[in-house]
């Protein structure tokens, strides 16, 4: 199994900053936006975007935590650990995740989201888009496009969980 670091801490920070600037540019009513991180690493990325928005715009946005496991079609989990600090009805939701691959996690996230309320709009921010979609889902905000083969895996590490910030590509062969 070969692993290669392809994005270091500084480059990862820049990608998050770029996503933040794009969110500012594309959202006329930032005070109506709710950032919703997809557990686990998406939550930490959403918090980092929130921190950058606070620094740049002096605006504190709510950050929710979305558990997709109970809504996935490939596993059965009863407990839903979703935490949403505000009513999402009519809000502009930005789902935040670390890697966009087949689109199945995002489908599950949207299913969970609409079970909580009726958002005005839903968009998607991902740190890495690696391609290979199985569903018609695309990200509105992308930190890095990293084409991969289907056998390769993208591993995103965040300091809050893994002790460091970096992105690696792993080839099991």
UniProtKB/Swiss-Prot annotation:
The record's listing under SUPFAM superfamilies reads: PRTase-like
Show the GO MF annotations.
Answer: RNA binding; uracil phosphoribosyltransferase activity
The protein's matches in InterPro entries, at most eight in alphabetical order, are given as:
PRibTrfase_dom (IPR000836), PRTase-like (IPR029057), PyrR (IPR023050), PyrR_bifunctional (IPR050137)
Pfam families from the entry? Pribosyltran (PF00156)
Entries under CDD domains matching the protein: PRTases_typeI
Question: Could you confirm whether the keyword Transcription regulation appears in this record?
Answer: yes
Keyword set, alphabetical order: Glycosyltransferase, RNA-binding, Transcription, Transcription regulation, Transcription termination, Transferase
- What EC number(s) is this enzyme filed under? 2.4.2.9
Q: From its record, what is one biological process in GO terms?
A: DNA-templated transcription termination
Motif PRPP-binding: where in chain: 93-105
Domain of life of the organism in this record?
Bacteria
Nucleotide-binding recorded as keyword: no
Q: How does it assemble?
A: Homodimer and homohexamer; in equilibrium.
Q: Which family does it belong to?
A: Belongs to the purine/pyrimidine phosphoribosyltransferase family. PyrR subfamily.
HAMAP family, A to Z: PyrR
Q: Could you tell me what this protein is called? A: Bifunctional protein PyrR
Origin organism of this chain?
Streptococcus equi subsp. zooepidemicus (strain MGCS10565)
């Amino acid at each position: 199994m070969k692993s290669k670091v392809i994005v270091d801490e500084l480059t990862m920070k820049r990608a998050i900053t770029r996503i933040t600037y794009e969110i500012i540019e594309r959202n006329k009513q930032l005070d109506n936006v709710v950032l919703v991180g997809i557990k686990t690493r998406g939550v930490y990325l959403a918090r980092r975007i929130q921190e950058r928005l606070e620094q740049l715009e002096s605006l504190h946005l709510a950050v929710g935590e979305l558990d997709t496991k109970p809504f996935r079609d490939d596993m059965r989990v009863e407990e839903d650990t979703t935490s949403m600090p505000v009513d999402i009805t009519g809000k502009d939701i930005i789902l935040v995740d670390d890697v966009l691959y087949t689109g199945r996690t995002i489908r599950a996230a949207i299913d969970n989201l609409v079970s909580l309320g009726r958002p005005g709009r839903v968009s998607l921010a991902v740190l890495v888009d690696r391609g290979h979609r199985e569903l018609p889902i695309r990200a509105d905000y992308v930190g890095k496009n990293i084409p991969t083969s289907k056998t390769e895996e993208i591993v995103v590490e965040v300091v809050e969980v893994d002790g460091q910030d970096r992105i690696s590509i792993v080839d099991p062969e």
